[in-house]
Swiss-Prot record:
Has very strong antibacterial activity against Gram-positive bacterium S.aureus and very weak activity against Gram-negative bacterium E.coli. GO terms for biological process: defense response to Gram-negative bacterium; defense response to Gram-positive bacterium; hemolysis in another organism. One of its GO terms (cellular component) is extracellular region. Keywords: Amphibian defense peptide, Antibiotic, Antimicrobial, Secreted. This is Antimicrobial peptide 2. It comes from Xenopus tropicalis (Western clawed frog). It is found in: Secreted. The lineage of its organism: Eukaryota, Metazoa, Chordata, Craniata, Vertebrata. The keyword Thylakoid does not apply.
Length: 25
């Protein structure tokens, strides 16, 4: 549904943000 898509996007965004903080380029 819509919520699963939204939550999936948020998780993906959060994961990318964490990776950027933990392993900056």
């Amino acid at each position: 549904g819509v919520w699963s898509t939204v939550l999936g996007g948020l998780k993906k965004f959060a994961k990318g943000g964490l990776e950027a903080i933990v392993n900056p380029k």
